[in-house]
Amino acid sequence: MRGKVGTAVTAVVAVLLGAFVTADAASVRVRCETRGDRSKISVDGNDLAPGSYTATLKSPASAASGVTAPAKTAVGDEVEFDFDSNANDVAAGATQISQSFIQGNTVRGEIVGGGVSVSGTATCRVKN
């Protein structure tokens, strides 16, 4: 009888450990757009643990410093950050950046919190 119980416990532990190993890793998607008079960037995190997160942008992607958005709480497993130079979008909750924030047509976004740090780089779409 002990052998059967030990085998059952081992099987349950193996299944639980397998669930942790196969869980989706946190990811980030960075999108950006630039116009002559506007910079617009979104940094979206997915497969995140519950918690509070911040997002930091750098442009060009290799810049030493950047702009950090106020902390947000993940909803489900997602958190979204918007950065914009348009006053209406800033009034609607986007973090303000300058019209000329995007340099070299690239940005790097990083989401930090909940014990993770994920980052990504994007080449910006140019609109006239």
Residue ranges and their predicted role:
Residues T10-G18:
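Bacterial N-terminal signal peptides
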Residues F20-A25:
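Sec/Tat signal peptide C-region and signal peptidase I cleavage site
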Residues A26-T68:
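Short, surface-exposed binding/anchoring microloops in extracellular/periplasmic proteins
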Residues A55, Q96-V116:
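Short, aromatic- and glycine-rich surface loops/edge beta-strands on solvent-exposed regions
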Residues D77-Q103:
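Short, solvent-exposed, Trp/other aromatic-anchored flexible loops in extracytoplasmic proteins
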